[in-house]
Amino acid sequence: MSHKLTILTLGAVLTSVYLAGAADFTIIQKNKAISVRQITIKVEDRITFVNDDSVTHNLYSETKGLEFEIELQPPGRSDTVQFSQPGVAEVRCAIHPNIKLQVHVRP
């Protein structure tokens, strides 16, 4: 019985560590600007981009290995991005060139 309890306890601890591993971040787009210019996250963390603006945005990164594109993001929509490797993603808006963000992704 004690072996079974030990295995169950170990499983619960490992599950908690796994679930606690990724963090969630929120970045707001408003007034044709972005709420931060730079952020540091870890691999597998999630960034949710919220369009709290009155205009459409189009965020993307062409950084090798960290590419993504949130095509047309109308006002009120949220989209989440997750990076699977370390590096520095240069994020831009295809519609508003003044929107720039550096995402530093650590291992």
What are these regions (language model features)?
Residues 10-12:
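Domain-edge interaction signal
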Residues 2-3, 7, 16-107:
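Extracytoplasmic copper-binding redox domains, predominantly the cupredoxin/blue-copper superfamily
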